[in-house]
From Swiss-Prot:
This is F-box protein YDR306C. Autoubiquitinated by the E3 ubiquitin ligase complex in conjunction with the E2 enzyme CDC34. Interacts with SKP1. Component of the probable SCF(YDR306C) complex containing CDC53, SKP1, RBX1 and YDR306C. GO terms for cellular component: SCF ubiquitin ligase complex. Pathway: Protein modification; protein ubiquitination. Residues 112-173 form the F-box domain. Residues 1-14 have a biased composition (Basic residues). Residues 91-101 have a biased composition (Basic and acidic residues). One of its GO terms (molecular function) is protein-macromolecule adaptor activity. Residues 1-32, 67-101 are annotated as: Disordered.
């Protein structure tokens, strides 16, 4: 038996919120209802993307209109319904414009021109950071820490947020302060999968803030599109090397800051399938060369920086890839003159850029004098005056090429500043080489101030004149 004392259920009318209109009832709205609202003739109609408004002077209020006529234009360019022409003939002139049905309003919205999202996305892609923001986002070292996009763009709407998100995470500017937040965003939030937006991951500024597990998880989350990775000074052990295997699109790998011991065999086991890898930098502190006979070099390697504890046996017995065009030596305490020339005898003719950095304690004061003999196609060369002498630019070491002119364009002369180095290379040594056409393509000479040259002397003036004859210049490199 039913409980008659129970109150009857009453269903509340369902209302939905429509952008630009507010709440509208949808129950029993099977047909669009037509209704008219009269506007005084002297009222000024204001049209916005959210709707139309006019000011009611009698009630001192602003009235919102959402259903404007869409078929005829009035005197001010607004449209008026022909269906109400009979009534508007008597009332239109008197009471003003007539507001039409829901269908007319929807038609008016559909015919409005809207900028496609694809074009907006392309515009956002080319937008630059304002100069004021770039200046504010510079650190004490002068490096930019900007994210590459104005953060206010993400607050415009949901579509703009989705379009700006890839640019925001493309190359995140990480520091010790925001690193933990970045790790939480990439690792913990798996639903958004923000890792596939990261293309460049620079952890060189992270000092004592990460752990091996953090770096390993970051590499796994960002492996799909990661093309550039700079390892941190610490927290790069065995686990990150294992995770590095999944970054198949990697093009730039810099391990120069790693202070932990890296086994050469494990490193090449991780990168052997990197067909797109072009830049590789060895760890600067220590590296274990055991098992180097079985290593397999990336097939498209262009740039190689040797540093750390590489041995003479490794340099002499390794079959170096002929694709290398840029080679750097940086703090190799065990490398001798014999090892360097053994390497240059294999790939010296293919090298376009060759750089030597201080210190190289196993080299003598004239160990680099024969560089031009092994590398005839260099475009840029950096020499440490500590390990070369004036005979490096003599006619015996630097002779003319028979088939073509020597293509060297830029020469860097660096110096550690030790005593007795100011007299090793004199400006006249370079002047004579230029005047004898042994360096016909030389355009730039960058000299370290530690070399001790007097820039106001006649010898330096002669060198400048000889360079100007070749449209070149002399620079003091601080």
């Amino acid at each position: 038996m039913a409980n008659k004392s129970r109150p009857k259920k009453i269903k509340a009318p369902y209302r939905k919120y429509v952008a630009g209109e507010g709440f509208s009832s949808t129950r029993n709205d099977n047909k669009a209802k037509e209704f008219t609202i009269t506007i005084p003739e002297d009222a000024e109609l204001i049209e916005t993307p959210q709707g139309s408004y006019y000011y009611d002077e009698t009630n001192d209020t602003i009235v919102k209109l959402t259903r404007l006529s869409n078929e005829k234009k009035d005197k001010k360019g607004r449209k008026q319904s022909p269906s109400s022409s009979s009534t508007s003939s008597s009332k239109g002139e008197k009471n003003g414009k007539v507001i039409e049905s829901e269908e007319a309003r929807m038609h008016s919205v559909s015919v409005k021109m809207v900028l496609p999202w694809e074009i907006q996305h392309r515009i956002i892609h080319y937008l630059d950071i304002p100069e004021k923001e770039e200046k504010l986002n510079k650190t004490a070292n002068g490096k930019k820490t900007t994210t590459g996009i104005n953060m206010n763009y993400l607050l415009v709407c949901r579509n703009w947020y989705a379009m700006c998100l890839p640019k925001l995470y493309y190359a995140p500017a990480l520091t010790s302060k925001n690193f933990n937040g970045f790790v939480d965003t990439i690792i913990i939030n798996k639903k958004k999968n923000l890792g596939h937006y990261v293309f460049e991951l620079n952890l060189s500024t992270i000092l004592q803030s990460g752990r091996n597990s953090f770096v390993s998880k970051l590499l796994r989350r960002c492996c799909s599109n990661l093309t550039k990775f700079i390892a941190p000074q610490t927290s790069f052990g065995y686990a990150p090397l294992i995770s590095l295997k999944s970054c198949h699109d990697l093009k730039f790998l810099d391990l120069g800051l790693v202070s932990e011991t890296v086994k050469l065999k494990e490193l090449f086991s991780a990168i052997k399938n990197f067909t797109k890898l072009t830049h590789l930098s060895f760890p600067r502190s220590s590296i274990d060369c055991q098992g180097f006979q079985d290593i397999q070099w990336p097939q498209n390697l262009r740039y190689l920086k040797l540093s750390g504890g590489i041995t003479n046996e490794f340099v002499i017995d390794t079959k170096w890839p002929t694709t290398i065009t840029t080679l750097e030596f940086s703090y190799c305490p065990q490398i001798t003159e014999l090892s360097i020339y053994s390497l240059l005898s294999q790939i010296g003719d293919n090298l376009k850029h060759l750089f030597f950095h201080y210190p190289m304690p196993s080299l003598a004061e004239n160990s680099l004098d024969h560089v031009f003999t092994y590398c005839a196609n260099l475009i840029s060369l950096q020499l440490m005056v500590d390990y070369c002498s004036k005979w490096c630019f003599s006619e015996f070491m630097l002779s003319k090429l028979v088939e073509y002119d020597r293509p060297l364009k830029t020469l860097y002369l660096e110096c550690s500043g030790s005593l007795g180095l100011a007299s090793k290379i004199h400006p006249d040594d370079l002047t004579i080489a230029i005047l004898e056409s042994r360096l016909p393509c030389l355009k730039n000479i960058c000299v370290s101030p530690k070399l001790g040259w007097n820039m106001k002397s006649d010898e330096v003036a002669d060198l400048v004149v000889s360079l100007e004859d070749q449209d070149g210049s002399l620079y003091l490199n601080y």
